[in-house]
UniProtKB/Swiss-Prot annotation:
Binding site for ATP: K534
Coiled coil feature spans: 806-871
Organism listed in the record: Streptomyces avermitilis (strain ATCC 31267 / DSM 46492 / JCM 5070 / NBRC 14893 / NCIMB 12804 / NRRL 8165 / MA-4680)
UniProt function note: Catalyzes the attachment of valine to tRNA(Val). As ValRS can inadvertently accommodate and process structurally similar amino acids such as threonine, to avoid such errors, it has a 'posttransfer' editing activity that hydrolyzes mischarged Thr-tRNA(Val) in a tRNA-dependent manner.
InterPro entries registered for this protein in UniProt: aa-tRNA-synth_I_CS (IPR001412), aa-tRNA-synth_Ia (IPR002300), Anticodon_Ia_Val (IPR033705), M/V/L/I-tRNA-synth_anticd-bd (IPR013155), Rossmann-like_a/b/a_fold (IPR014729), tRNA-bd_arm (IPR010978), tRNAsynth_Ia_anticodon-bd (IPR009080), Val-tRNA_synth_C_sf (IPR037118)
Domain notes: ValRS has two distinct active sites: one for aminoacylation and one for editing. The misactivated threonine is translocated from the active site to the editing site. The C-terminal coiled-coil domain is crucial for aminoacylation activity.
Protein name: Valine--tRNA ligase
NCBIfam families associated with the record: PRK05729.1 (NF004349), valS (TIGR00422)
Subunit record text: Monomer.
Reactions that this protein is recorded to catalyse: tRNA(Val) + L-valine + ATP = L-valyl-tRNA(Val) + AMP + diphosphate
Protein's gene: valS
Annotated EC: 6.1.1.9
Top-level taxon: Bacteria
Skewed-composition ranges (Polar residues): 1-10
Localization, UniProt: Cytoplasm
Length: 874
């Protein structure tokens, strides 16, 4: 466990400042790590590889708590693997973020009174590159602040030349394999961004709308349909009913007049229609609804588009030129004037899709676009998990993954933007269509032009695990570091990004999945569990907390909340608590160094060690084993808790405190404990380093004289256990804890000394008598000693003389008042829980809260009564 090639005894008596100031060391330490190349990856190394990619943040972005959370987990994994002897590669980079970046630069142009069309495509793209050079590197500096151990020399951007070649290569391969095609289909159209967006980029929310029922046809041949989008009725080409619906069988096959027009449309029978919903009849607008489009395909209905790309009505007549919402009101008014409105419901709350970027209401629109045929790709992505080639943590997330990949529709990959990877297809003057690979010659001559669309951002980021390693070239890095060892990412982009990487990785890399493991984490929320958002007023800039408390404090807080696949609540007071933990580590190490703690030489033989020494070494090895197992299972919260409680409770609060009497006594025992304490701190600091790298680097190098804990050996469980010593110290802890609790109950100050008679019933406690007296602030009994309280505790009896130390009368009066309050609380809570009418109406969380109040009242009553029973009569 203690082997460490970087460890040397300090050259001289080490000194640490009295207080830890993160701002004084973090920047310097990080730059030193980078300069020494600790984070770089060598493709020629004989070490086993450990590879993980950064989920590439948008070039428009800055570090938010979600990034900080994710990066903390990845960095912890990578730092541990580096210490374990792996050739580690944490691949950094950024995403070009097509829509988001174009929107940002367009807003900048707007401030100058210009649009992208004023510049033209080439000049606009050049302007975006200029913006990226000036503003796009903000997040890199923030990653350094957090301590991200990425291989900066390998930083990539999804629009880099090499990655662009990868995009062109896989597009050509998919096209040649007939897995990419161009077709006119219904897509999600954003009238603000003026581009198609994918299903997973549509955010649904409940909006107040209207539900209008209107009558189609004339005379006896009429039928009532209901819609929330009356403006689309101008493009209706049929009314559909279920073939088994007896109400409408006489109309199937007939044509009826479409109101407000001179057109007649057929009534068709289709099993898609639910006869139990509404009137059992639906209007069919194939050019403006995905389900209607499918009905139209089955019945050979024409597609009539009624809106342009700005969602403005184009059909000639009184509604031409109106925005869709204006047209909706005007059309309903016109129908009402004709007496065709049967019913109107306002407001009618229903789920409406919005663009995730600009929040504009999405318009389903028939459009010619490029598509990926995902069937065979999605099947391979599902099979890789089913067959165990890729594992998902936590396992219960597999169902969500399968639900997605097993039900994927073909993916619309074209976007009507200027910023992005332009589709590598050229059109000739005579209808020729040529897909051009990176090694192909571009068609030239009069009449040839390239497709104006660009690819969906997720197309290029789907290649990230292998394009960043040089693919399609067969590079040393690709051979060494593919597939990735693990992907750490949020469950919220399981479908956006993870599934696409799986599909493309398996396809491009001959069936080899892009990673062995997918470790999913939750979303960061505020301390009340609410989503963080600027609009909610609860968004936090992590740099503010890092400035105030240090990067280690933020990292430890985030790791301690990271249960697999579960959302993470976080509040500033929790970060402050983690800062206190860093200070505790600092102060304990400083005390140890001032009292002779050392890593020099071998550990003293077991027979020279005290029970306290053997106990802490036993617990140390058990903690190493526990932390290792939890790391391997991606249980960051549990391993952080294990480290916290071992370091704070067992090392600092118990071992260091118990050792103080040994150090004060001097001699050989003090030397032995000094070496044991040095060992424990050395290993503990190495265990903590992946999560809190800065404070551990400062302390470990001071303690050991080693070059850097970044490249130190990861601790290994030696197998040493001493159950007898553990039991002995547990008994000792019980004695001290029980008497401390009694002292606190009696209102004694922590440092207040009390005359006491200490009788050790357990002989194993005899060597600890001095420590017991010191920690409990017990002073020897004098001639006038009179025991006013006797405490029989595990292995010992402690008689205390409290006369003159507390006012017995006042204390009994205070406790009696507290007891009465607790009994009143119990009665009130019990009455509510005994009220059946209340229980029937109250929400579960309210009932649970009252049950908690009752349980606490019971605990308080028992505790206060015990204090009164132990207290002498006045």
């Amino acid at each position: 466990m203690t082997e460490n090639s970087q460890q040397q005894p300090p050259a001289s008596e080490p000194e640490l400042p009295t207080q830890y100031a993160p701002a004084d060391v973090e920047g310097t330490l990080y730059e030193r790590w980078v300069e020494r190349g600790y984070f770089e990856a060598d493709a020629k190394s004989d070490k086993p590889p450990f590879t993980v990619v950064i989920p590439p943040p948008n070039v428009t972005g800055s570090l938010h708590l979600g990034h900080a959370f994710e990066h903390t987990l990845i960095d912890a994994l990578t730092r541990r693997k580096r210490m374990q002897g792996y050739e580690t590669l944490w691949q950094p980079g950024m995403d070009h973020a097509g829509i988001a970046t174009q929107n940002v630069v367009e807003r900048e142009l707007g401030k100058e009174g210009k649009s992208r069309h004023d510049l033209g495509r080439a000049a606009f793209v050049e302007r975006v590159w200029q913006w990226k050079a000036e503003s796009g590197g903000q997040i890199s500096g923030q990653m350094r602040r957090l301590g991200d151990g990425v291989a900066w020399s390998r930083e990539r951007f999804t629009m880099d030349e090499g990655l662009s070649q990868a995009v062109q290569t896989i597009f050509k391969k998919l096209y040649d394999d007939e897995l990419i095609y161009r077709a006119e289909r219904i897509i999600n159209w954003c009238p603000r961004c003026l581009t198609a967006i994918s299903d997973i980029e549509v955010e649904y929310q409940d909006d107040d709308g209207e539900l209008v029922s209107m009558k189609y046809g004339e005379g006896d041949d009429t039928i009532v349909v209901a819609t929330t989008r009356a403006e689309t009725m101008l493009g209706d080409t049929a009314v559909a009913v279920h073939p088994d619906d007896e109400r409408y069988k006489h109309l199937v096959g007939k044509t009826i007049r479409l109101p407000l027009t001179e057109r007649f449309i057929p009534v068709v029978a289709d099993t898609h229609v639910d006869p139990e919903f509404g009137t059992g009849a639906v209007k069919v607008t194939p050019a403006h609804d995905p389900n209607d489009f499918e009905i139209g395909q089955r019945h050979n209905l024409p597609n009539i588009a009624v809106m342009d790309e700005h969602a403005v009505i184009t059909v000639s007549g009184p509604f031409q030129g109106l925005d869709r919402l204006e047209a909706r009101s005007a059309i309903v008014a016109a129908l009402r004037a004709e007496g065709r409105i049967v019913a109107e419901k306002r407001p009618y709350v229903h789920s409406v899709g919005h663009c995730s970027r600009c929040k504009t209401t999405i318009e389903p629109r028939l459009s010619m676009q490029w598509w990926v045929k995902v069937g065979p790709l999605a099947k391979a992505a599902g099979d890789a998990v089913r067959e165990g080639k890729v594992k998902i943590h936590p396992q219960e997330m597999e169902k969500r993954y399968f639900d997605w990949v097993d039900n994927l529709h073909d993916w619309c990959i074209s976007r009507q933007l200027w910023w992005g990877h332009r589709i590598p297809v050229w059109y000739g003057p005579n209808g020729e269509v040529v897909c051009v690979g990176p090694d192909d010659e571009v068609p030239t001559g009069e009449g040839w032009s390239q497709d104006t669309d660009v690819l969906d951002t997720w197309f290029s980021s789907g290649l990230w695990p292998f394009s960043t390693l040089g693919w399609p070239e067969q590079t040393e890095s690709l051979a060494k570091f593919y597939p990735n060892s693990v992907l750490v990412t949020g469950y919220d982009i399981l479908f956006f990004w993870v599934a696409r990487m799986m599909m493309f990785g398996l396809y491009a890399m001959d069936g080899t999945p892009p990673f062995h493991t997918i470790a999913l984490h939750g979303m960061v929320r505020d301390q009340f569990g609410k989503k963080m958002s600027k609009s909610f007023g609860n968004a936090v800039n992590p740099l503010d907390w890092m400035d105030k408390y240090g990067s280690d404090a933020l990292r430890f807080t985030l790791a301690r909340g990271a249960n697999p696949g579960v959302d993470v609540p976080i509040g500033e007071d929790w970060v402050q608590g983690s800062r206190n933990f860093a200070n505790k580590i600092w102060n304990a190490t400083r005390f140890a160094l001032m009292n002779g703690a050392t890593v020099e030489g071998e550990l003293p033989p077991v027979e020279q060690q005290s029970a306290t020494d053997r106990w802490i070494l036993s617990r140390l090895n058990a903690t190493v084993a526990e932390v290792d197992a939890l790391y391997d299972d991606y249980q960051f919260a549990k391993l952080s808790d294990a480290l916290f409680h071992f370091a704070w409770d067992e090392v600092f609060d118990w071992y260091v405190e118990l050792s103080k009497t040994t150090f004060m006594g001097g001699g050989e025992a003090a030397k032995v404990s000094g070496r044991v304490l040095g060992e424990v701190l050395d290993v503990t600091l190495r265990l903590l380093h992946p999560i809190v790298p800065f404070v551990t680097e400062t302390l470990w190098t001071t303690l050991t004289g080693g070059e850097s804990v970044v490249i130190a050996d990861w601790p290994v469980d030696s197998g040493f256990r001493d159950q007898a010593a553990e039991k002995e110290i547990e008994t000792l802890q019980s004695v001290i804890t029980e008497v401390r609790r009694f002292r606190a109950d009696q209102g004694l100050q922590p440092g207040q000394r009390v005359p006491a008679r200490l009788t050790l019933d357990d002989t194993a406690l005899a060597p600890h008598e001095a420590a017991i007296r010191q920690l409990l602030r017990l002073q020897p009994e004098g001639e006038d000693f009179a025991a006013t309280a006797t405490l029989p505790v595990a292995g010992a009896t402690v008689a205390l003389d409290l006369s003159g130390t507390i006012d017995i009368v006042a204390e009994r009066k205070r406790l009696a008042k507290d007891l009465a309050a607790a009994e009143k609380e119990k009665a009130q809570a019990g009455a509510k829980l005994g009220n059946e009418a209340f229980l029937a109406k109250a929400p579960d969380h309210v009932v649970d809260k009252i049950r908690g109040r009752l349980a606490k009242a019971d605990e308080d009553i028992a505790r206060i009564q015990a204090q009164l029973d132990r207290m002498p009569e006045a």
